[in-house]
Regions:
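Active-site and adjacent substrate-binding regions of carbohydrate-active enzymes
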Residues: 2-13, 18-29, 33-645, 660
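Regulatory N- and C-terminal appendages and interdomain linkers associated
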Residues: 3-7, 44, 580, 594-759
Length: 759
């Protein structure tokens, strides 16, 4: 660990020029020594602990003469303090996203080079998991230095440039702050174990035996047998809620609280817009409890929020608390004593997947009804997948067994109490199911977070250890290493690329060139959500339906709002078409317009009922009594509502990927998931000519069907997929490319038969 000055930490740096989409930022990234480790104001005056580990106080880097601006007053960023309500978050795993210097490891400048792509996609905020120095025994969540950047990822100048370049594009930056534990390689722990009476001796939870807190559950049941681990050097046990190499900090020690405050101050001075507070339910311990969500923990989080509001106003905090909503809601705090700005809603996620296989909306409806109201200052965070396993901790034993049978029939698909698979393979590469999942994610209460690669339908490598199965390199194009890195030796890559038949088609470049791809669908639905802020700010109310397979809810602005809007969102979780009547009595007599197709739908009758027919896995977003309908295609070019200077496509894609300039190629048989017609059969029959297709107001049969030969009409509205999949045909995981071979449907087979494994 370096004890010297931070390299060039306070020197003005030349701005990195914005690179066109898909091109690396000019200049190489020098590998610098890590900056000095963080101390604290309280610790700085204390003597150096025995063992020769000096820990000087460091100061966050700043450009001389340029003050740190409040989060709501930064160039390129809107001044709206409520920006997070309508934002789309995107988790970019740094080491697997983009490599700028050819060493096989993703880095900060690689992320900078892809900011134009993220702005084009419709991302408002990038969440970056840990990039600090670490032994990388838990994906970087085992931190050995809180105030440095792992030299494999770049330098502090690179990070500051990332924040600047992101803000110039209207994109905010949220970083992970692991406040519960450190790595056992952290100097604090090394000092604590070697000098129990020294200034760091009480930084962790030590005991003479392992009998304490025996009501606390073990989180990583696959690898850990106890929450205590014995340290030979100190001759005592230390407490850890996660891996044994991640000792928990002792928040009963005021110096620990001040040290963590200083770490957060350090990064807030770089201009980041928020912090995801990792694993916060476990900060304190108490005998006779399960050591989760204790009052002392809430005091600690409230203290962090108070410090940020006072010193860095507008900076948000996002709680990662894998708990039931009744417990999580406490992390919002109160209006008088706020805690977190946002909290992830964990239980709704597995129930979306459960509902898709059960063919009923009851599981989703149940968890939403169990979700308590939250304070006015708060907002839920929602997601379908992330860098961890799809947790099944908050489903019943019977539901868990059923989900394992549906989604993880092979043992190696599982991790801890969950499933280590990506979105598209989970859903058997069904375009209609993936679309429906996104339609639910983007219309339910909360701000959605996408996981890198899910927008193109990336697969997983279940042969990798633990959760690395879903952390493989981003697939940008069909060049060597999928455009992720220029390194010659594939063994130098941070993780192996997915190797499966047809995998080269699952790239940003391929899907960018096809207007009917999953990537373009994702972009359009994100921009549609952006053009209707009610989906982020509006009230939410479940609506009674005549069919349990159909979920209906409204998102409504305050009726007194001069430009308020009301949306009715309807989703059919069944694999068969359904006709349903929805009750919305206060909207009786109002007209409805389909936001995806831009066409009028039936008006709600005088009794407040609306009857619709939905195709299999079909969905609608209906604007109620709006004068000017907007289609997805119009929404795609929507301005960034003040948070972006332009939403135009990146320079290298504007002239080559329009329907007018590019004839539609016949899609490869091996890749019909992304490119096949939504109205085609499993035999891969191309679409009928436009004149033979049903009209846009045919509610049961409407399709956009651009998979066959001939030009694609880019002005045609994008319509949700409603094709009924024939049972038993082509049910292979996504990275093995569902589809047809030689124009013939595959025979019926079990869900596990003939699996091609990524190696």
């Amino acid at each position: 660990m370096s004890t010297g000055p931070m390299p060039a930490g306070n020197e003005p740096q030349a701005a990195v020029p914005a690179a066109p989409f898909g091109q690396p930022v000019p200049g190489s990234v020098p590998v610098a020594a890590p900056v000095a480790a963080a101390g604290t104001a309280a610790m700085a005056a204390l003597p150096t602990p025995s063992g020769g580990i000096p820990m000087p106080m460091t100061v966050a880097p700043q450009i001389p003469g340029v003050p740190v601006l409040p989060a709501q007053a930064r160039p390129g960023i809107s001044a709206d303090p409520e920006w997070f309500r309508t934002a789309v978050f995107y988790e970019a795993l740094l080491r697997s996203f983009a490599d700028s210097d050819g060493d096989g490891i993703g880095d900060l400048r690689g992320l900078i080079s892809r900011l134009d792509y993220l702005a084009w996609l419709g991302v408002d905020c990038v969440w970056i998991p840990p990039f600090y120095p670490s032994p990388i025994r838990d994906g970087g969540y085992d931190i050995s230095d809180y105030t440095a950047i792992d030299p494999r990822y770049g330098t502090m100048e690179d990070f500051r440039e990332l924040v600047h370049q992101a803000h110039q594009r209207g994109i905010r930056i949220v970083i992970d702050m692991v406040v519960n534990h450190t790595s056992d390689a952290h100097p604090w722990f090394q000092a604590s174990r070697s000098d129990p009476e020294g200034p760091y001796g009480d930084f962790y939870v030590w005991a003479d035996d392992d009998s304490g807190y025996d009501d606390a559950r073990i989180i990583f049941v696959d690898t850990e047998e106890s929450n205590w681990a014995y340290d030979v050097e100190r001759g005592q046990f230390y407490w850890h809620r996660f891996f044994s190499h991640q000792p928990d900090l002792n928040y009963r020690n005021p110096a620990v609280i001040e040290a963590i405050h200083d770490v957060i101050r350090f990064w807030a001075r770089t201009g980041v817009d928020g912090f995801r507070l990792d694993a916060i339910p476990y900060l304190t311990e108490s005998e006779g409890t399960n050591c989760e969500n204790l009052p002392g923990t809430h005091e600690i989080i409230a203290g962090i929020r108070e410090m940020l509001d006072r010193e860095f106003p507008g900076t948000i905090t996002l709680a990662e608390a894998n708990q039931w909503p009744d417990d999580v809601v406490e992390y919002f705090g109160t209006e008088e004593a706020p805690e977190c700005t946002m909290c992830f809603h964990f239980p709704v996620m597995p129930r979306i997947f459960y509902a898709l296989r059960q063919g009923s909306a009851e599981a989703i409806r149940w968890v939403l009804e169990k979700t308590p109201d939250i304070p006015a200052h708060g907002q839920w965070g929602t997601f379908l997948r992330n860098h961890d396993e799809l947790t099944l901790e908050m489903v019943t034993d019977a539901e868990r067994d059923q989900m394992y049978a549906w989604y993880a029939p092979e043992e190696r698909m599982r991790a801890n109490i969950g499933i280590r698979r990506r979105l598209a393979p989970l859903l058997d590469a069904s375009r209609s199911e993936v679309e429906l999942a996104y339609a639910l994610l983007l219309s339910l209460p909360g701000s959605p977070c996408l996981y890198y690669g899910d927008e193109i339908g990336m697969g997983e490598n279940i042969w990798l250890e633990d959760r690395d199965a879903v952390r493989t390199p981003m697939q940008w194009d069909d060049s060597p290493n999928m455009g992720f890195s220029t390194v010659v030796d594939p063994g130098a890559l941070t993780l192996p690329l997915i190797q499966a038949p047809g995998y080269a088609h699952l790239t940003v470049a391929t899907e960018m060139g096809r207007p009917d791809s999953l990537l373009h669908f994702t972009r359009r639905i994100l921009h549609l959500r952006r053009s209707h802020p009610v989906l982020g700010r509006g009230g939410f109310l479940l609506r009674p339906t005549s069919d349990d397979a159909v979920l209906a809810h409204t998102r409504c602005d305050d009726p007194s709002a001069p430009e308020g809007e009301s949306l009715l969102c309807v989703a059919n979780l069944s694999a068969t078409p359904r006709s349903v009547t929805i009750e919305v009595p206060e909207l009786a007599g109002r007209r409805t317009i389909d936001l995806f197709g831009g066409c009028p739908f039936p008006s709600i009758d005088e009794h407040g009922r609306l009857t619709l027919t939905l195709g299999a896995r079909g969905y609608y977003w209906l604007s109620v009594d709006r004068d000017t309908p907007e289609s997805v295609e119009n929404a795609e070019g929507t301005e960034h509502s003040g948070d972006s200077q332009s939403s135009a496509p990146p320079a290298d894609t504007t002239s080559t990927h329009t329907a007018q300039n590019r004839p539609t190629e016949r899609m490869p048989d091996a890749h019909r998931f992304h490119l096949r017609s939504q109205g085609s059969t499993e035999r891969g029959v191309d679409r009928a000519p436009a004149a033979q297709r049903p009209g846009p107001v045919d509610l049961a049969q409407r399709h956009r069907d651009p998979g066959g030969p001939g030009p694609v009409d880019a002005s045609a509205p994008l319509v949700p997929a409603q094709r009924r999949r024939r049972p038993g045909a082509g049910l292979l995981a996504h990275h093995r490319l569902l589809g047809t071979r030689g124009g013939r449907a595959r025979p019926r087979h079990s869900r596990t038969a003939g699996r091609q494994r990524a190696r």
